[in-house]
Design a protein with these regions (language model features):
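Residue-level signal for inorganic ion chemistry
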Residues: 29, 143, 243
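Acidic/His- and Gly-rich active-site-bordering loop/insert found
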Residues: 2-124
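Residue-level "edge-of-site" marker
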Residues: 62-63, 160, 281, 314
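Active-site oxyanion-binding pockets that recognize sulfate/phosphate
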Residues: 8, 12, 32, 36, ...
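Histidine/acidic-residue-rich, glycine-tolerant segments that coordinate divalent metal ions
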Residues: 66-71, 88-96, 100-101, 107-109, ...
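Metal-dependent amide/peptide-bond hydrolase catalytic core
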Residues: 202-324
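Generic structural signal for well-ordered, non-membrane alpha-helical segments
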Residues: 4, 8-11, 15-22, 39, ...
């Protein structure tokens, strides 16, 4: 083995030695699932783990109480690398996406790398970033806006899956709420006096369905009616729908957004209602991984004997705030 391979083996051995310690934290987070922006127990478990291994930890960065930044500064020149951890859960399901593993893997990798950096006097700054609200709220996008990632040369995250892959593909995504406002009236006695907001919502859905044919492959639009009225014998004066719009490219997604907006405006005109739009959560952009880093991941997977497949469009695609 050359020096690099010896160091990789040392890292692998250290990770195995500390496996039980890391598993306890992961199991604790799994057993205490917390929704976006409410991950107080998970945050504290990860922060205490990192502090116990000498990281300087700051809680509540970027105006998010459940975020954190853990730093090891070698005091020597070098790159700044961030390992990103997630730890929020899904409503009702819990940790169905394995965020207990993501948060713990980031902290665990940071602890192991810090020990190796100290032993071999490797320069640079190592950060572990606690990024809340990936499932709803896009905490990383908020952190980008607050400058948390400025000065970072590389940011990495591991996501569990049923197959190992060194690269990833994701949709850019935006969620919009459309509120249609009409005029109430009795649906039997004098419906002509009203303007039906629910009709506006229904017509918008039909218009969006007509547009699907014209969107590029690997684009998605899916929506639900969140408010449709309170009584069947009255003309609904307010109705709401939420649409999620996705595409492989952020710029094309925004073209789709313009088309969806036209569907809403046209539906409002046709039903003599009015429509208002509100963006829900942060926009998430498509992931564009650095190909050199991807190749390093491949080599490291080969080194430890990890079997993997290459990512492609047939495997199912989701969205994540990592792309921001």
């Amino acid at each position: 083995m050359d020096n690099l391979e010896l160091m990789k083996q040392e890292i692998s051995n250290l990770a195995k030695e500390k496996k039980e310690e890391f598993e306890k934290v992961s199991d604790y987070i799994f057993a205490n699932p917390e929704l976006a922006f409410k991950e107080y127990k998970s945050q504290e478990a990860l922060c205490k783990l990192l502090e116990s291994h000498g990281f300087v930890v700051k809680r509540g960065i970027a105006e998010m109480p459940t975020s954190f930044e853990a730093v090891f500064d070698s005091g020597k020149p070098g790159k700044t690398v961030a390992l990103m951890g997630e730890y929020d859960c899904l409503p009702e399901i819990g940790h169905g996406c394995g965020h207990n593993l993501i948060g713990t893997s980031a902290a665990g990798a940071g602890i192991v790398l810090k020990e190796v950096m100290e032993k071999h006097e490797i320069g640079g700054v190592l950060k572990v970033l606690g990024t809340p609200a990936e499932e709803k709220g896009s905490g990383k996008a908020i952190m980008v806006r607050h400058g948390v990632f400025e000065g970072i040369d590389a940011a990495l995250l591991m996501h569990p899956c049923d197959e190992s892959m060194p690269d990833d593909i994701s949709f850019a995504a935006i969620t919009l709420e459309f509120t249609f406002k009409g005029k109430p009236a009795h649906a039997a006695a004098c419906p002509w006096k009203g303007a039906n907001a629910l009709s506006g919502v229904q017509l918008m859905f039909h218009a969006v369905d007509m547009m699907r044919l014209h969107f590029k492959d690997y684009s998605r639009v899916h929506g639900i009616i969140t408010e449709g009225g309170v009584a069947h014998n009255t003309i609904t004066d307010e109705a709401k729908a939420v649409f999620n719009i996705r595409s492989l490219e952020y710029d094309y997604m925004m073209e789709m957004v313009d088309a969806i907006r036209d569907c809403a405006k046209g539906a409002a005109i046709a039903t003599r209602t009015e429509v208002e739009e509100r963006q829900v959560d942060e926009v998430v952009k498509d992931v564009r991984n650095d190909k050199k880093l991807v190749q390093y991941v491949r080599k490291n997977m080969d080194f430890i004997g990890e079997e993997y497949i290459e990512r492609d469009l047939t495997q199912g695609i989701g969205s994540t705030d990592v792309g921001n």
